[in-house]
């Protein structure tokens, strides 16, 4: 078992928006990164992604709409759906990669 100070882990990373894998839970990667105010171009993944803001806020654009994820909130970016980071995000972000074959069917 390990205890992580997520804000400290993010602060010690050499570069913003470059994640470090802290570990795995089942098939999912648990990653941490430090956000800064710059924008990030559209991303599309073949897996779902959980975006958990630990401190600060994350500004996303998804399907033409702005989504603001605040500290303590989790946003799930669906597989195959383009999303981009808008300027002005800051703080600590935890990313949980959910491979498509690991996402339970709701139907």
Predicted regions and their residues:
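Short, conserved beta-strand element in jelly-roll/cupin
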Residues: 35, 44-60
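Short histidine-centered beta-strand/loop micro-motifs
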Residues: 21, 33, 40-45, 62, ...
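A short, N-terminal "cap"/entry segment at the start of jelly-roll beta-barrel domains
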Residues: 1-33, 39
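Short acidic-glycine-tyrosine-enriched beta hairpin
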Residues: 64-79
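A cytosolic small-molecule/anion-sensing beta-strand core signal
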Residues: 54-55, 70-71, 89
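Structural motif
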Residues: 29, 50, 57-59, 66, ...
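Ligand-binding loop in jelly-roll beta-barrel domains
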Residues: 79-106
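Residues that act as N-cap/strand-start positions at coil-to-secondary-structure junctions
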Residues: 16-17, 45, 54, 77-79
